Swiss-Prot record:
Pfam families: TACO1_YebC_N (PF20772), Transcrip_reg (PF01709). GO terms for cellular component: cytoplasm. It is found in: Cytoplasm. Belongs to the TACO1 family. It comes from the Bacteria. This is Probable transcriptional regulatory protein APH_0480. Its main location: cytoplasm. InterPro entries: Integrase-like_N, TACO1_YebC-like_2nd/3rd_dom, TACO1_YebC_N, Transcrip_reg_TACO1-like, Transcrip_reg_TACO1-like_dom3, YebC-like. GO terms for biological process: regulation of DNA-templated transcription. It comes from Anaplasma phagocytophilum (strain HZ). GO terms for molecular function: DNA binding. Keywords: Cytoplasm, DNA-binding, Transcription, Transcription regulation. Disulfide bonds: none annotated.
């Protein structure tokens, strides 16, 4: 029985991992479709698509699925007609939250997000309700293996006019986040792509002016549970906030 229980636990974990991977692949596919429809279906002529493909490759989305998403973008299927929507609100512990979604049904997405916020003791707000707590910036992310060292990308980013460079640990490797003014984003992204190849992520971002730490381990656990529920929503692409875990 113990052996059977262990097998069942492994099978359950694998099933959960497969489901999470499937959700991630679906989100990457949607990002590619929206990017391809924003301009040319040729990545070299469409920086948004090039960035979306780079993100997809970083998370191991198979090449045939990337190509299928680009083909889908050239069709007129209603289910693949996505709208970019930004939601703002307060999560547990009054942390400011910005949710970036791609949806083919605005009412459904708003209802589902409102339910998640409310269930975790937060509140979904109106557009602009928390934006004053953030700066709108450009963000280009590289893995450490892509650039060699902090000093290398620091020198390059600084020479291009970036306003900051942050070092992060994503659990697998170090990442370098190049921060720039919105008006400089395209120029700096393209120059870095030319120097280091495509980054893991390149997009406009909401950067908190100040970060707040949860008051306790219990508060941290509540916030993580809330963020996990947001991430599990099919329409949510990514979440930003003024929290520090």
């Amino acid at each position: 029985m113990a052996g059977h229980s262990q097998f069942a636990n492994i099978k359950h974990r694998k099933g959960a991992q497969d489901a999470k991977r499937a959700k991630l692949f679906t989100k990457l596919r949607k990002e590619i479709i929206v990017a391809a429809r924003s301009g040319s279906p040729v990545p070299e002529l469409n920086p948004n698509l090039r960035s979306a493909i780079a993100s997809a490759k970083a998370f191991n989305l198979p090449k045939d699925r990337i190509e299928a998403a680009i083909r889908s973008a050239q069709g007129n299927e209603a289910d693949d007609s996505y709208e970019e929507i930004t939601y703002e609100g307060y999560g547990p512990g009054s942390v400011a939250i910005v949710v970036h979604a791609l949806s083919n049904n605005r009412n459904r997405t708003a209802g589902e997000l409102r339910h998640i916020f409310t269930r975790h003791g937060g509140k979904l707000g109106e557009r602009g309700s928390i934006s004053y707590l953030f700066d709108h910036v450009g963000l280009i992310v590289y893995g450490a293996a892509q650039v060699g060292s902090f000093d290398v990308i620091f020198d390059e980013a600084t020479s291009l006019g970036a306003i900051d460079l942050e070092e992060h640990d994503n659990g697998e490797e170090k990442e370098y986040h190049v921060i720039c003014q919105v008006e400089d984003f395209g120029r700096i992204r393209d120059a870095l792509y030319e120097k280091f190849s495509d980054g893991v992520t390149a997009r406009l971002s909401w950067r908190p002016k100040q970060k707040v730490k949860p008051a306790s381990d219990e508060a941290s656990a509540k916030l993580i549970s809330f963020l996990n529920d947001l991430d599990d929503n099919d329409d949510v692409q990514y979440v930003e906030g003024d929290f520090e875990l």
